[in-house]
Amino acid sequence: MQTSNFRKKNAAEVDFFMGYGDVNRYEVLEVIGKGSYGLVCSANDIHTGEKVAIKKIHNIFEHISDAARILREIKLLRLLRHPDIVEIKHIMLPPSKMDFRDIYVVFELMESDLHQVIKANDDLTREHYQFFLYQMLRALKYIHTANVYHRDLKPKNILANANCKLKICDFGLARVAFTDAPTTVFWTDYVATRWYRAPELCGSFYSKYTPAIDIWSIGCIFAEVLIGKPLFPGKNVVHQLDLITDLLGTPSLDAISQVRNDKARKYLTCMRKKQPASFSHKFLKADPLALQLLRKLLAFDPKDRPSAQEALADPYFNGLAKVEREPSCQPIPKMEFEFERRRATKEDIKELIFQEILEYHPQLLKEHISGTERPNFHHLSVVDQFRKQFTQVEENLNGSGAAVSLQRKHSSLPRSTIVHSAAIPAKDYKHVASSSTKLAVDGSWNAQIQGVHANIAGEPSTIVRPAVSSERSLAPTLQWQPNMTHFLNHALCYQNTVFSGSLLDATGPAQAIPRTTPYVDYRSGNLDLYQHHVSREDVQSDTATAQAHAASHGPVPAVSYSLPGTYRIT
């Protein structure tokens, strides 16, 4: 009886893929996000072997404004292909062209977001700060050269992997400008974005905007990375302006004239004179060059803020990469967003979303364009094989209450990638970080990175999770063998594996163990490995000591996160 009630209660969510094409391509693993929009599940792509995130967006046509936002986002993510922007890998084909209500969008999987990284790490280094900002600006350069303004940049909209890779996501509020003149548009989602909104937009719902608004947001995010908390957590518009002027000083009358809201402009005009605060006192121990650039990014007057390309050329990034090699994007054709320039009906939006889905089904798109398509696409249902899987993940979620990490309701979660300094062409991008990657150690050890086992000299050895306190998480541990001396592949850094063996036993031999720590080569922007030795005493001591020892022998270790089921040195 209890089972029967459970099935009735969860019937809508159990039939996760009901009637949709391509469902036999994916194996659902677990629920990783749940919100008003629907569900996000992690899954295995059986065709490629990759782990992906499948976002089910339900009842998308209930409100036309929501449908338009979804259309805008999937269209922009198709047009903006860049390593620093989250990628849509696939959109499932609905069972019927005009009778569908839900869509299933397959994203690359990322581990966390910058909000969680800032929250969980109090030991980020100058190299982390520099590389994080560089990636954000590199993405912004690409976005802005396409004449797109994100308009909702904040730490939760910047996804992160343990190899320090960042990707901008959530383009639902983005806008495309088709002239060089400032564009006036209605600004929604005001409260959620206040802390990262440029001062010229404070208190204004209809606002003119330029690329400078995104630059301000990046400055706020970078400052938050530096100090570990939001820079301007205003409770309302007046408080927001107070916090901004406490740091930057009273703006000039010319800068105040850029503020769109009459009351905000009057408040700033009548404000007592404030001197700028010392950035070196506010951001203790920060690189002086970083603070010089931050002050430019946070210029009160939008005309004084640098473009993303100008910021990339700042001395702060000297030696990191060549700015001229960082890619630009062709401006987006006006016809792609014609629906925003006219009063589109629900049927118009549905047809346009269906056309976007067909972009991921080339043969059907060809038929659609030529007019030879079938009126409806009915697919053989293979829901039964998903029913059990989805029931299980739902049962875990509802039964334990904390079986999965639901605090990050983002559409994209983990994928093992390598940081690239230049953009990857769209046709090559799918080949990055193949899931079949293996390591060769002295020609005798092959470890399957994304699995749960390793074969050492032909003998299986199980990865075990070390016993740790609730306050500390460790890396997956492999039994160390004397022949493990060389690590030849970047893929290992995704797991942050620590090697242990009899040397950890007080009675074992006092020999050094090889340990490979991932780091980012900040001159080239590529992820690399640094091999060194950690003594038995180091390993037996607190892991933070071992981490410090490792850091003193080379570049910074990879970032650590606090995700359930993820084990690493912290």
UniProtKB/Swiss-Prot annotation:
GO biological process: intracellular signal transduction
SUPFAM superfamilies membership: Protein kinase-like (PK-like)
Positions bound to ATP: I32, G33, K34, G35, S36, Y37, G38, L39, V40, K55
A molecular-function term among this protein's GO annotations: protein serine/threonine kinase activity
Annotated keywords: ATP-binding, Kinase, Nucleotide-binding, Phosphoprotein, Serine/threonine-protein kinase, Transferase
A Pfam family it matches: Pkinase
Cellular component terms per the entry's GO annotation: cytoplasm; nucleus
Domain Protein kinase positions: 26-317
Chain location of the short sequence motif TXY per the record: 188-190
PTM section of the record: Dually phosphorylated on Thr-188 and Tyr-190, which activates the enzyme.
Active site residues of this protein: D152 (proton acceptor)
Domain of life (superkingdom): Eukaryota
Modified residue annotations for Phosphothreonine: T188
Family: Belongs to the protein kinase superfamily. CMGC Ser/Thr protein kinase family. MAP kinase subfamily.
Domain notes: The TXY motif contains the threonine and tyrosine residues whose phosphorylation activates the MAP kinases.
Name by which UniProt lists this protein: Mitogen-activated protein kinase 11
Organism: Oryza sativa subsp. japonica
